[in-house]
């Protein structure tokens, strides 16, 4: 058996070449030999450069379900990948030992904690010679488009490098609770439910009524007052139930509307992404049409406002009547 500073070559022989990282330790990763046996050795990851949208590209719902299934997480939105914890565990799964999961903040809730995780991910990319620039500043902001682009690329990178071995993500992170990052939008439709009894007038009356003294005879209300109070209470209960039903219907309709808007947004974003990739492929031809399309895709609101001002001034100048010459 090789020593702690030795590795196994693909043919099973000892490799005495010591390769050290910045900390002076050997970090091997797993790969297959020709015989199908498991061995540990240094090597390069399979890089993926294609980012074009194809039929194999997964939707945002499917890709989140894939992430949760592979690394046993409970994410609900693409934006929650901004913590970087899932990517760190993916790298440990693909290349065991290239990253220390003990240093990963699986319960990260703040931006500086997200940056910490992405620094670990960058270091693992460097060790495995992954030619991919991680847009950390964009990802940690939790924007949908930036995180969707990166996870789509990472899915292809995963498919190109996964060797099919079994992996227990919970055991690998030593039972750390992987709490998804907070999502402000999630609180809109998940308001805490209050018990109907706590909101009823009868409950408030029961809490506010003083305790009867021992030996004193409490005065009993008349039958007419009891009937009127019970009637008003039942009426208010029915009104509250009606309001609850109406609010639930509104929440359901808003959820459906939101899902429709998100699907439409994803559809048009995919179209724009395809146009952008075509423009990038033909950008070296110095085509005026391609350049105009690129200007439209990357134009900001401020830039668009500035471009409209000269046109408005030119139209106003054309509408002015010509001045008569003086003799």
From Swiss-Prot:
Lineage of source species: Eukaryota, Metazoa, Chordata, Craniata, Vertebrata
Species for this entry: Homo sapiens (Human)
Domain EB1 C-terminal, chain residue ranges per copy: 236-306
Phosphotyrosine modified-residue sites: 167
Gene behind this protein: MAPRE2
Protein name: Microtubule-associated protein RP/EB family member 2
Region named DCTN1-binding: 187-327
Subunit structure: Interacts with DCTN1. Interacts with APC (via C-terminal). Interacts with monomeric and polymerized tubulin. Interacts with SLAIN1. Interacts (via the N-terminal region) with BAG1. Interacts with ASB14. Interacts with HAX1; this interaction is essential for epidermal cell migration.
Modified residues (Phosphoserine): 9, 219, 236
Keyword Cell inner membrane set for record: no
Endpoints of the signal sequence: none
GO cellular component, one term: microtubule cytoskeleton
MF (Gene Ontology): identical protein binding; microtubule binding; microtubule plus-end binding; protein kinase binding
